[in-house]
Amino acid sequence: MFKRATGLTVAMLGMVLTAPAVAQPAAACQAHGQAALEAWTQGRFDQVGKDFAPVVAGKLTPEMLRQVWGQLQSQAGSFRSLGALAPRSLGGQDVLVAMLTFSDAPLAAIIHCDAQARIDGFRVVPAASVQPVAAAPEPAIAGAVSRAMPVPSPLGLLPGTLTLPEGKGPFPAVLLVAGSGPHDQDETIGPNKPFRDLAAALAKAGVATLRYDKRTYAHAAQIDAKAFTVDDEVTNDALAAARLLAQQPSIDPRRVFVLGHSLGAMLAPRIGQRDPRLAGLILLAAPARPLLEISAQQVREQGQRSHETAAQIAASEQAILAEQKLLAAADPRHPPVGSFGGMPQRYWLSLHEVHQVEVAKKSSMPMLILQGGGDFQVSPTLDFSRWQQALAGRPQTDFHLYPGLSHLFMPAGKTETVADYQTPAHVDAKVIADIAAWVKAQPAR
């Protein structure tokens, strides 16, 4: 469930191992944290936890550290360098941050210590997520009017932007729900901003949008990792945002749609199930299979492209198989303890209980399902085709496959790795035109 640079493997780039209390960065903490990161990046996994606090040492075994390190490299590319830890304030909390440079995507390590300078927080996130949340002012969009619209969440407001067409309205509106990982409201991936592309072009076509920073981006330091679920990551904030959007005078409350991308698309039927007032659902690159099944496919394919050994790939596949068996036998009332791939078992169990295709089949909402033919993360044959087969004959359901487009609905690259996302591009105009036409053709609910 990372996308990881965008994506489907939550374990990898969003590795949240603890939810520390009050950080106290000091010389001893800095020394311990730097030594732990050096041991980890050099493959000395049995030495990483020398200065871990008991709460972390019990979760991050040498084998778990080895496993996550392999996942990071399979998704972010080969490791290049480790920077020095430096004090930072994230979400109102003092921590230590060091940059990790990989061939395909930059990451950041975040270290937190307790009062005894023992490491009680150790996580890795996309480098962009440690940048200040207060970004530069929203650039003007020709033919549109944008204004700030924060979305309420239990951890605090999520910065958001409402983009309206020029004119009086009320307008049909689309709520943009991002994929897995800590994403800003533009769903920024390298130099690309797919959600900003959608907001700008849809406004010109007469459709309003609301996009917002994810909770994992805006308030990462406040998240309780032990209790974190996929509804906390996606569903609940999307429902709050949809209600807020429908309340705006410039928006037609009977024509509010949800557009989900990747994990956001996987959760779109669940969002529609919980808010029957929505006018329809738009799924971009929607996984039809369980996320761990997709992760296993990614481990094989990305591992081969990254020149991992057969033994390394097999070990990663076996770990995923063991996790699948654990979740299949788990009691939802008593989630397994511990974590997998850096995420708590409660989170994995919440994903295991998502049955997006079955929920979609029972829904009466109009649906538009879009897929890039060059997507190496969500499969055009194993996922998109499954949606087509399962929903064949379902009323008010439309499908579009776009040959040559990537997971971001931009021109697909040649490497079939996340390195392709570092090439500047924009969401294909045909995709946006199809979305706008479909939205405007749907009746008010």
Describe each PLM feature range:
Residues 280-362:
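Accessory cap/linker subdomain of secreted extracellular hydrolases
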Residues 167-201:
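Short, surface-exposed "cap/lid" segments of acyl-processing enzymes
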Residues 227-249:
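Alpha/beta-hydrolase active-site loop
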Residues 376-382:
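Conserved alpha/beta-hydrolase "acid-adjacent" motif
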Residues 363, 369-371:
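Short beta-strand/loop motif that positions the catalytic acidic residue
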Residues 129-169:
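N-terminal cap/lid segment of alpha/beta-hydrolase-fold proteins
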Residues 30-31, 35, 46-91:
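Short solvent-exposed beta->alpha transition segments
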Residues 244-302:
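Primarily recognizes the serine-hydrolase "nucleophile elbow" in alpha/beta-hydrolase
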